[in-house]
UniProtKB/Swiss-Prot annotation:
Keywords: Disulfide bond, Ion channel impairing toxin, Neurotoxin, Potassium channel impairing toxin, Secreted, Toxin, Voltage-gated potassium channel impairing toxin
GO cellular component: extracellular region
Role according to the record: Toxin that blocks voltage-gated potassium channels (Kv).
Domain notes from UniProt: Has the structural arrangement of an alpha-helix connected to antiparallel beta-sheets by disulfide bonds (CS-alpha/beta).
Primary location: secreted
Record-given protein name: Potassium channel toxin
Known tissue expression: Expressed by the venom gland.
GO molecular function, one term: toxin activity
Family: Belongs to the short scorpion toxin superfamily. Potassium channel inhibitor family. Alpha-KTx 21 subfamily.
Disulfide bonds: C6-C25, C11-C29, C15-C31
Source taxon at top rank: Eukaryota
Biological classification of the source: Eukaryota, Metazoa, Ecdysozoa, Arthropoda, Chelicerata
Keyword Ribonucleoprotein: no
Transmembrane intervals: none
Length: 34
């Protein structure tokens, strides 16, 4: 599932590592803090 809890900075870093923008992270990874 793309819905998960995580550190927003780590989520952004992870998505950028996959060649995605942080907006992709917010919309798909659904990073919601801890």
């Amino acid at each position: 599932t793309p819905f998960r809890y995580c550190n927003p900075r780590n989520c952004a870093k992870e998505c950028q590592g996959r060649g995605k923008e942080t907006t992709y992270c917010d919309e798909v990874c659904k990073c919601s803090g801890w």
